[in-house]
Amino acid sequence: MALPRCMWPNYVWRAMMACVVHRGSGAPLTLCLLGCLLQTFHVLSQKLDDVDPLVTTNFGKIRGIKKELNNEILGPVIQFLGVPYAAPPTGEHRFQPPEPPSPWSDIRNATQFAPVCPQNIIDGRLPEVMLPVWFTNNLDVVSSYVQDQSEDCLYLNIYVPTEDGPLTKKHTDDLGDNDGAEDEDIRDSGGPKPVMVYIHGGSYMEGTGNLYDGSVLASYGNVIVITVNYRLGVLGFLSTGDQAAKGNYGLLDLIQALRWTSENIGFFGGDPLRITVFGSGAGGSCVNLLTLSHYSEGNRWSNSTKGLFQRAIAQSGTALSSWAVSFQPAKYARILATKVGCNVSDTVELVECLQKKPYKELVDQDVQPARYHIAFGPVIDGDVIPDDPQILMEQGEFLNYDIMLGVNQGEGLKFVENIVDSDDGVSASDFDFAVSNFVDNLYGYPEGKDVLRETIKFMYTDWADRHNPETRRKTLLALFTDHQWVAPAVATADLHSNFGSPTYFYAFYHHCQTDQVPAWADAAHGDEVPYVLGIPMIGPTELFPCNFSKNDVMLSAVVMTYWTNFAKTGDPNQPVPQDTKFIHTKPNRFEEVAWTRYSQKDQLYLHIGLKPRVKEHYRANKVNLWLELVPHLHNLNDISQYTSTTTKVPSTDITLRPTRKNSTPVTSAFPTAKQDDPKQQPSPFSVDQRDYSTELSVTIAVGASLLFLNILAFAALYYKKDKRRHDVHRRCSPQRTTTNDLTHAPEEEIMSLQMKHTDLDHECESIHPHEVVLRTACPPDYTLAMRRSPDDIPLMTPNTITMIPNTIPGIQPLHTFNTFTGGQNNTLPHPHPHPHSHSTTRV
């Protein structure tokens, strides 16, 4: 595993450049260069012994273990399990950023997994509501991985490939004695290896990196794979909305893990300048959020602005989904504090009280957010996440990273199963209930809900087969998939590609055959994970007990080649070609497919399945329903309040505002056939007896009327206000600079943020001096409101967290974007209500 001499100049040059960049301490240049060169040669001279794998890191020596894989084409992998990357976040360090681990003098055995971060288990089992099908179908097995819990849980696992596998030797032999073989070596044999850091999902509430064995991916792709534990739930994301507990500790754990990797992976033969982060579900949204945080900047090995990692793969999750960010963390902090007897007004005392509680008492509390949202997760704290993710993307904060992202065909499978009885299809009444419940939980304006419901029903009704329950089930599945995954992913890809940054988009259309999922299911959330990890190559496992076929093995090899190619070069097509003749004697279809870069104009994506092809504009009609039409419907009720992140409030204290009574009728702002004669208004659940031609006529008439009456009336005003909104973005969300980096003292940072807040207040007030407004930020895109629950209260202010007082006011029952009571459900009772209608979304 020692580096060849031809690679030494490359590392020496990197060390010299890093030294020059970091010479700010005033040390003599000669001494600085000498120290960097000694460090570099120490890294290069280390040899990883397969028999007794011992590595000396910056914190001490660790011993790994060699593991043979159950496939003759895969070489052995050396595993280093339970490696500490941070100090235990216990006691007064709870709800604090992580600190580097303490060094050790003896050899540390890294041969078994470390404890997982605390999470809620009931009678030894994780919650039943788990989204990935392989979680739900193997809940007992998954639960066995999270029994050993401890707050001392900040560890990672490293999987290092060896050079003696048949696949490696085959590629090396094919190179022969060609000149410049080092430059042409498509497997990176002998050189520093790319590094892939996997972030697990679980809705920021459950999971562990220990679940994901990176051995096959490391061996087949000749990359180093790392899996990480990070703090979850209340311990990882509690925020009081001020300096008492800023939140985002789980994200800071991941940043510390990347910092540790950048500084130590060279000892394992890894390349600190080729680090890729990837994850699925909530792990994918973490990946996206890390690309937007200035904490990810700064790699001591290089003067590059790309920071602690250079590439990112977001599988079935981005920062724009409704479940990606918690918009009212202080409310949930107060609820938790009340449950455990820490409900004091001063937030500093509140946090001190929570720090003294046993961790199990905290994680066992049931704090339920609105459906499709999260209670404890990443927050806009003005620091780790400086602003709303969409605004940061519009400003190009992630343009320095190569990004691959995508979705699965039927992500919303568990949403459908958890809402309605779908074994025999979906009845008309169940379909109506699901859509109404969906709208009530995601959109907070009562006057326009009737129009929105009918619009969604119209768009997701297959009019050629509208009476078929199985067809309704299929369209309902598409509704959840499109809103929660596809539209956010496409919006993210559009924003990233707008800056010319390399962007690749995929749609995954395959899943393994098993009796544990219904026959009608498509590729559901998490179904791509076993193929990324190469599980089909070693056969069924406890976590993935599928009947893998040769097609599954072939597809897994294809996916691993794409993923590891991207980690090596930023291009999934290079350098290793798609060659799976070791599985099939005939070429696979992927050999003839070139995965084209994504652009907003063409929106090209790769269809990953047994019949691969490059297509364009993935589900364009439905995507634009959510990204274009629905936001316009949301704002047609009151065009004078165009910016949906502001709302007028009386000059008196908002806590004195009376709530709307449940008995108050909710009427639509738009005339419909239903409102003409209330006596003939049908029940929302008598769909089977309803004349769909009448509904179609009504919907078309309403839509045509809205378009005709509003396009001419509001076109000019829309353009003017849209232009002003973008101008406000530029003024109110200033670009970050390195001046507010970690080198600032806390007092300087607080003062800086306070000054920004004061300046921005005056600047924003000049926009509407006659209005009293309550803002979550200077106006972001109106699609921000699409990601909030109806009872969201804007308690966090981007870039101004230090300005929030050290007390949390009483929980406000009103949503500031509308006038109905938070949490009110405007749908009629469902004949078969789901027992957990507000269960936390798991992604």
UniProtKB/Swiss-Prot annotation:
Record field: compositional bias (Polar residues): 661-670
Membrane topology: Single-pass type I membrane protein
Highest taxon of source: Eukaryota
Biased composition (Basic residues): 831-843
Compartment(s): Cell membrane; Postsynaptic density; Synaptic cleft; Synaptic cell membrane
Result after altering residue 90 to I: No effect on protein abundance. Not associated with changes in subcellular location
Glycosites: 109, 303, 343, 547, 683, 686
GO cellular component, as recorded: cell surface; dendrite; dendritic spine; excitatory synapse; external side of plasma membrane; filopodium tip; glutamatergic synapse; Golgi apparatus
Record-linked InterPro entries: AB_hydrolase_fold, CarbesteraseB, Carboxylesterase_B_CS, Neuroligin/BSAL, Nlgn
Feature: compositional bias, Acidic residues: 175-186
A Pfam family this chain is assigned to: COesterase
Transmembrane segments: 698-718
Function of the protein: Cell surface protein involved in cell-cell-interactions via its interactions with neurexin family members. Plays a role in synapse function and synaptic signal transmission, and probably mediates its effects by recruiting and clustering other synaptic proteins. May promote the initial formation of synapses, but is not essential for this. In vitro, triggers the de novo formation of presynaptic structures. May be involved in specification of excitatory synapses. Required to maintain wakefulness quality and normal synchrony of cerebral cortex activity during wakefulness and sleep.
Family classification: Belongs to the type-B carboxylesterase/lipase family.
Protein name as it appears in the record: Neuroligin-1
Lineage of the species this protein comes from: Eukaryota, Metazoa, Chordata, Craniata, Vertebrata
Name of the gene: Nlgn1
